[in-house]
């Protein structure tokens, strides 16, 4: 199992820094050719990345990334939104009380948000009480407004920490980024003007638990450190390394994309912004296991080809292709020139696409230029075909040709409502829907008759009202009687003038009104 661990790390180190597995390895440096005997052929050592001259090994401790470290470092936090609930009451003349609730926003302070979060996490009843609607106050024939401020805590709110600059990333932040938590700034602004984001753990230090301490052997030549053998037994060269900080920790980014923190006496330049670190997840670990099996299979094929060469005492271009080094590093290259077996020292590099080494027809790119051929023969079984095309007799396995994108992070368990822009930015400052679910329902309510009197006062008022009602009824009846009395008298005198007649002494009937009009004297 240990050789397997040593086997795949160099290959995957170079491949993962590009996000793809290499399909081939080819020398970027090729030494002079020299003739050799058939017995000098050997299968390459794909277990280690060899470096020249560094034979002095001494134990030391270093720091590296944890196994299974993923690209997105999760930082748990919470959002805090300030909400003002306003109760407006109006009491009319007869005592009916109408209450209307309204909600608006205000920008909270970090200290108040931290206190509210601690209350919520501790189960303190003060947090739930702070969310209740205000108890409305009221006065007769007046409008009274009662307000109450509440802090809505929504947790968890998970953000991603960038290990390179310690910035925080979330769709809830303006522009998707927050510069980070510092001593002077303990919160992040959000897309919502009245909501701030704060980490669960107070303080300027953000969680960055991605490192582990390991022990290995330092490979040096005099005072110069060439590389080291990690605790898994794999040699790693410091050639081409650059300085890079992760979560504020200074370390070295190696050429294979791995990162270590170790002390060196050599001055190393800083990495350019595009130089990142290989970030492995569990999916890539599964692929690496399959790559190990494939490389072991290639090792067996190389040994079979070497055994066939020794047995038959003959060499072919196809058999020479099995002797190629499969991982980046120092090795040998073989070819046949004019029926003579030739060998050269070579330093191999990874190839991502065939266009890198075959940019045009008939060109095999080695060391940045087209490599010359001898009678149509290059090396490691690569030849020039009759049609002028470069023919490579073998490729890496189909598994190594897959262009697999590594999983970036685990799934966030909760999608914070601020991540959806449609939930915010209403017109005005009315409370948005995403906080309404965390508050009691508000509604318009109308109370019964209530003038603010005690129970005995209510009965006194009812009795007085009844007495006043009786007095009004009696007064109305009396007024009606007095109004009808003169009308009845007028009817009794004026109503007989037309119908009553008088009789004179002579017996003649004379109408009474006519006697008055004629001025006659009537004697009764």
Swiss-Prot record:
It comes from the Viruses. Changing residue 10 to L: In strain: AVO1. Keywords: Disulfide bond, Glycoprotein, Lipoprotein, Membrane, Palmitate, Signal, Transmembrane, Transmembrane helix, Viral envelope protein, Virion. InterPro entries: PH_Rhabdo_glycop (IPR055448), Rhabdo_glycop_CD (IPR055447), Rhabdo_glycop_FD (IPR001903). Residues 481-524 are intravirion. Residues 1-19 form the signal peptide. GO terms for cellular component: membrane; viral envelope; viral membrane; virion membrane. GO terms for biological process: entry receptor-mediated virion attachment to host cell; fusion of virus membrane with host endosome membrane. Homotrimer. Interacts with matrix protein. Interacts with host TRFC. Interacts with host BST2; this interaction inhibits viral budding by tethering new virions to the cell surface. Interacts with ITGB1. Interacts with host GRM2. Belongs to the lyssavirus glycoprotein family. This is Glycoprotein. The lineage of its organism: Viruses, Riboviria, Orthornavirae, Negarnaviricota, Haploviricotina.
């Amino acid at each position: 199992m240990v050789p397997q661990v040593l086997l795949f790390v160099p290959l995957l180190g170079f491949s993962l820094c590009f996000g793809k597995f290499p399909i081939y390895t080819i020398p970027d440096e090729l030494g002079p050719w020299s003739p050799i005997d058939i017995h000098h052929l050997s299968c390459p050592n794909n277990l280690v990345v060899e470096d020249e001259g560094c034979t002095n090994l001494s134990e030391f401790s270093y720091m590296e990334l944890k196994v299974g470290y993923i690209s997105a470092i999760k930082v748990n936090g919470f959002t805090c939104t300030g909400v003002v609930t306003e109760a407006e009451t109006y009491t009319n003349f007869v005592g009916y009380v109408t209450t209307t609730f309204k909600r608006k926003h205000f920008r909270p302070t970090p200290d108040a948000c931290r206190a509210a979060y601690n209350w919520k996490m501790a189960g303190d009843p003060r947090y739930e009480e702070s969310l209740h609607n205000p108890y409305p106050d009221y006065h007769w024939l007046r409008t009274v407004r009662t307000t109450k401020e509440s802090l809505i805590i929504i947790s968890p709110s998970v953000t991603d920490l960038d290990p390179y600059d310690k910035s925080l990333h979330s769709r809830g932040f303006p522009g998707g980024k927050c510069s980070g938590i510092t001593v002077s700034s303990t919160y992040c602004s959000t897309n919502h003007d009245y909501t701030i984001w704060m980490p669960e753990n107070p303080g300027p230090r953000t969680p960055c638990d991605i490192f582990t301490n390991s022990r290995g052997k330092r490979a040096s030549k005099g005072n110069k450190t060439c590389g080291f053998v990690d605790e898994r037994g794999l040699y790693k060269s410091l050639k081409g390394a650059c300085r890079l900080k992760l979560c504020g920790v200074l370390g070295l980014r190696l050429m294979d994309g791995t990162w270590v923190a170790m002390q060196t006496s050599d001055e190393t330049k800083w990495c350019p912004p595009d130089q990142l670190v290989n970030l492995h997840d569990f999916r890539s670990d599964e692929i690496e296991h399959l790559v190990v099996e494939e490389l072991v299979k290639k090792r067996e094929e190389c040994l079979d080809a070497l055994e066939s060469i020794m047995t038959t005492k003959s060499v072919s271009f196809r058999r020479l292709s099995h002797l190629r080094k499969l991982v980046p590093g120092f090795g040998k290259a073989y070819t046949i020139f004019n029926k003579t077996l030739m060998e050269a020292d070579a330093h191999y590099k990874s190839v991502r696409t065939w266009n890198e080494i075959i940019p045009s027809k008939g060109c095999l790119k080695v060391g940045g230029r087209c490599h010359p051929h001898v009678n149509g023969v290059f090396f490691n079984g690569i030849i020039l075909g009759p049609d002028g095309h470069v023919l490579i007799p073998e490729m890496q396995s189909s598994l190594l040709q897959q262009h697999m994108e590594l999983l970036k992070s685990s799934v966030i368990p909760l999608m914070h409502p601020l991540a959806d822009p449609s939930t915010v930015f209403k017109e005005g400052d009315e409370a948005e829907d995403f906080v309404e679910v965390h508050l009691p329902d508000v509604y318009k309510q109308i109370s019964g008759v209530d003038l603010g009197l005690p129970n005995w006062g209510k009965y006194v008022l009812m009795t007085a009202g009844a007495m006043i009602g009786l007095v009004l009824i009696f007064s109305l009846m009396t007024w009606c009687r007095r109004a009808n009395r003169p009308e009845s008298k007028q009817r009794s005198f004026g109503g007989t003038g037309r119908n009553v007649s008088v009789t004179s002494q002579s017996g003649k009937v004379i109408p009474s009104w006519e006697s008055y009009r004629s001025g006659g004297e009537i004697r009764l």
